[in-house]
């Protein structure tokens, strides 16, 4: 699973997810991409599950790029612990996703195969997404 090698601060504040993405909004590597249409947190396990679903469908053809990285730590307190006594220890890592952000890219396969592979991957993610191609990435 994806996670940072080392971080400056072990714990982060929750933050607010407002506005659309202004970076990572264009297709950089592949021919087809999966783009987020709503904001949310995507866990490192969900990123990996979507990657596995895509690679199993396209088999040995094509190349996949993961354009998101889980760099935000989520903390959790142990079960059956009373409130207070500080913030919990880091538990998992998430990627903050905003609308318009490109999540995955793919090339080397036909559009039908890419569309179906991204559909399978989208079922593993907690946010709504859409399929875009290199020519139609800035429409609506």
From Swiss-Prot:
Domain of life the protein comes from: Bacteria
Listed name of the protein: Large ribosomal subunit protein uL16
Known partners and oligomeric status: Part of the 50S ribosomal subunit.
MF terms in GO: rRNA binding; structural constituent of ribosome; tRNA binding
Organism of provenance: Trichlorobacter lovleyi (strain ATCC BAA-1151 / DSM 17278 / SZ)
Any single GO CC term annotated in Swiss-Prot or TrEMBL for this entry: cytosolic large ribosomal subunit
GO biological process terms on file: translation
Family: Belongs to the universal ribosomal protein uL16 family.
Lineage: Bacteria, Pseudomonadati, Thermodesulfobacteriota, Desulfuromonadia, Geobacterales
Role summary: Binds 23S rRNA and is also seen to make contacts with the A and possibly P site tRNAs.
PANTHER family given in the database record: 50S/60S RIBOSOMAL PROTEIN L16 (PTHR12220), LARGE RIBOSOMAL SUBUNIT PROTEIN UL16M (PTHR12220:SF13)
Record HAMAP family: Ribosomal_uL16
């Amino acid at each position: 699973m994806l996670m940072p090698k080392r971080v400056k601060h072990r714990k982060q504040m929750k933050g607010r997810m407002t506005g659309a993405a202004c970076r990572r909004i264009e297709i950089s590597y592949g021919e087809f991409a999966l783009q987020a249409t709503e904001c949310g947190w995507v866990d490192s396990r969900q990123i990996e599950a979507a990657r596995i679903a895509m690679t199993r469908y396209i088999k040995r053809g094509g190349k996949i790029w993961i354009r998101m990285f889980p760099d935000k730590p989520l903390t959790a307190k142990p079960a059956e612990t009373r409130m207070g006594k500080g913030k919990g220890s880091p538990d998992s890592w998430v990627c903050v996703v905003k609308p318009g952000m490109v999540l995955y890219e793919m090339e080397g396969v036909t559009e039908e195969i890419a569309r179906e592979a991204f559909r399978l991957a989208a079922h593993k993610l907690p946010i709504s997404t859409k399929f875009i191609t290199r020519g139609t990435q800035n429409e609506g």
